[in-house]
């Protein structure tokens, strides 16, 4: 979301605009969150493992990352590998990103609704 959209959302108590492709570190202190959510945007990260390591750092012990994915992407913005592998391989790729970044208990779930775009959820746990 852009700054204008975030400002217009009066349900938010806090927000920030931060380009993870130019600065892959999340702008929060260590051990801040119980959950980190990446919603249909992992395919646009140019340094995904660095970003995921940063996410691991801002999670508290037993915190979880949740990555929501679908088969759609903007070809002009998505990194090359996501455009050249099958959707099921994208799930495997993101799972390996999480493992390399240091997450445990990495799982992938298919939560696709009937007659709609697929929805895949990949999660990982910060053990300590």
Model-derived regions, located:
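Class I SAM-dependent methyltransferase SAM/SAH-binding core
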Residues: 1-26
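General small-molecule cofactor/ligand-binding pocket signal
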Residues: 16, 107-109
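A short acidic, Gly/Pro-enriched loop at the edge of an enzyme's catalytic core
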Residues: 23-36
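A short SAM/SAH-binding and catalytic strip from SAM-dependent methyltransferases
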Residues: 34-49
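A short glycine-rich, Lys/Arg-flanked "PGG" loop and its adjoining helix->strand segment in the class I
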Residues: 49-64
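Conserved class I S-adenosyl-L-methionine
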Residues: 64-95
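Core SAM-dependent methyltransferase catalytic element
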Residues: 101-104, 111-128
């Amino acid at each position: 979301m852009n700054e204008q959209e975030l400002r217009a959302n009066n349900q938010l108590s806090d927000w920030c605009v931060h380009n993870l492709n130019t600065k892959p570190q999340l702008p929060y202190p260590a051990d801040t969150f119980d959950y980190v959510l990446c919603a249909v945007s992992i395919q646009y990260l140019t340094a995904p493992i660095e970003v995921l390591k940063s996410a691991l750092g801002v999670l508290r012990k037993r915190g979880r990352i949740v990555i929501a994915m679908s088969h759609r992407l903007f070809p002009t913005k998505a990194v090359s590998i996501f455009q050249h592998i099958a959707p099921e391989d994208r799930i495997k790729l993101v799972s390996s990103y999480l493992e390399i970044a240091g997450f445990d208990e990495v799982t992938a779930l298919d939560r696709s609704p009937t007659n709609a775009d697929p929805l895949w959820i990949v999660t990982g746990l910060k053990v300590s």
